[in-house]
């Protein structure tokens, strides 16, 4: 069977998920899981959708959902992408936005371990920047990057697995310092202790 794999697969490093205890009841914040069940109205909506609609394709543009999300965050519907979980959205971002011949994607050396997996999968050159001794992202390191060599920057906020967050002022300073570099803020854990940068989109 191995003879059918594409040659580049040999160079890929598999994603290694965080520790997942199999016994006992834990609140797994590292997996972004909630200890609470969905609201009763949500459960009822899921049941209603499952009754007679599962055999149909959903509306391709997810217009109604995008309208609601856009209204909640104060942005435009065309600025909302709906996917099957954040990993799918990340995969599209890596393939569509970060892949530029002769330029690198930059992220912290201690960060979400799926980043190098996607970079390898899509053939994206990478450069990592060390976090500080207290596990912080030094925004000055990113402000000093050369846009002729770097296409894009990505980091979680708060960072994973360190949980240390950047302030909006720091993120805004980076955006102003690097107008020619795409900056992606991965906010998978933003509700645990950081301010969303979505409001900066309109600036």
Say what each PLM segment does.
Residues 1-56:
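N-terminal "arm"/small-domain region of PLP-dependent enzymes with the aminotransferase-like
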Residues 196-203:
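Conserved active-site segment immediately N-terminal to the catalytic lysine
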Residues 63-104:
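Phosphate-binding glycine-rich loop
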Residues 32-35, 86-87, 112, 157-161, ...:
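Short glycine-rich anion-binding loops that position phosphate/pyrophosphate groups of nucleotides
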């Amino acid at each position: 069977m191995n003879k059918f794999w594409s040659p580049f697969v040999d160079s890929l490093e598999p994603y290694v998920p965080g520790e997942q205890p199999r016994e006992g009841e834990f609140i797994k914040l590292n997996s972004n899981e909630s200890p609470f069940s969905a609201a009763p109205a949500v459960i009822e909506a899921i049941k209603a959708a499952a009754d007679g609609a599962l055999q149909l394709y959903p509306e391709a543009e997810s217009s109604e959902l995008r309208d609601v999300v856009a209204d909640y965050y104060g942005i435009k519907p065309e600025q909302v992408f709906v996917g099957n979980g954040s990993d799918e959205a990340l995969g599209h971002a890596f393939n569509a936005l970060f892949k530029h011949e002769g330029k690198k994607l930059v992220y912290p050396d201690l960060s979400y371990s799926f980043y190098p997996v996607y970079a390898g999968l899509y053939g994206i050159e990478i450069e990592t920047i060390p976090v500080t001794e207290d596990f912080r992202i030094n925004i000055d390191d990113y402000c000093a990057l050369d846009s002729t060599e770097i296409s894009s920057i990505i980091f979680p906020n708060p960072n994973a697995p360190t949980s240390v967050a950047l302030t909006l002022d720091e993120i805004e300073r980076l955006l102003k310092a690097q107008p020619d570099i795409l900056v992606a803020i991965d906010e998978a854990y933003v509700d645990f202790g950081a301010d969303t940068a979505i409001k900066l989109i309109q600036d």
